[in-house]
A protein has these predicted regions:
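Positively charged n-region of N-terminal signal peptides that target proteins for export
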Residues: 1-4
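Tryptophan-anchored aromatic micro-motifs
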Residues: 47-59
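C-terminal motif of bacterial Sec signal peptides marking the signal peptidase cleavage site
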Residues: 12-15
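Calycin-type beta-barrel ligand-binding domains and close structural analogs
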Residues: 17-45, 66, 70-78, 83, ...
């Protein structure tokens, strides 16, 4: 029963998970896609393509026209608990479908146990009018339009290690303002607008220990 309750708790966590939304409450936006005056890319450069995995077995799958975030969930329990598990699922063909969120789980028997597995795939980036990619100083800059302004993520690849930089804190803002001629503008108490020049943006990306950097090791070419 404990495993059953744990599994349902895990299912709830999976159902509540958002695609790459690690921070909330403080936001920095750019007036225009970064870096300004640089041409937009029409595809992801070869250097950045591949499948990368972090220490939590989260995958970043970078293809020519799209970047996906993938997570695999597995849970094993005794087959005697299957009747209890079934109350939260519908059996459709050879898969169990969650009544909570319609997630689909494959299953297999392993001796006296049964294993449920599920793959969550979220779109990290795709070329749209509201999502644009540019490149500067060897880094890939992903721009995401939110209403009329833009948020960014910066990606670099060095020695088969993918690094994704998130800029999100008040301390980050102070360091950015120290580099720019035009200081940030407060839109509301937790939202600031940035207008760096191209060279200033390049310097921002190269600041040491700016924001948080997540690392993924390359496990496969695309």
């Amino acid at each position: 029963m404990k495993k059953y309750l744990f599994f349902l708790g895990l299912l709830f966590i999976v159902s509540c998970k958002k695609a790459d939304t690690p921070y909330a409450g403080f936001s920095m936006y750019f007036e225009k896609p970064q870096p300004i005056n640089d041409s937009e890319l029409s595809k992801i450069p070869n250097k950045f393509r591949g499948i990368f995995m972090n220490s939590d077995s989260m995958y970043i799958n970078i293809k020519e026209n799209i970047i996906l975030q993938e997570k695999y969930y597995k849970h094993r329990f005794h087959k005697n608990e299957l009747d209890s598990i079934k109350t939260a699922f519908d059996l459709v063909g050879n898969q169990y479908v969650s009544k909570l969120n319609k997630d689909v789980f494959d299953y297999r028997y392993l001796g006296d146990s049964i294993e449920f597995s599920n793959k969550q795939i979220d779109t990290f980036f795709v070329f749209l009018d509201t999502q644009k990619a540019k490149r500067i100083d060897g880094q890939l800059v992903l721009n995401y339009k939110d209403s009329i302004y833009w948020k960014i993520k910066a990606i670099s690849v060095e020695k088969n290690m993918l690094k994704i930089k998130y800029i999100y804190s008040e301390e980050d803002l102070k360091r950015i303002d120290s580099l720019t001629k035009v200081k940030s503008t407060m839109i509301d108490s937790a939202l600031f607008l940035l207008k760096p020049s191209r060279n200033e943006f390049k310097r921002i990306l190269n600041l040491k220990k700016l924001g948080e950097t997540r690392e993924y090791k390359k496990v496969k070419n695309n």
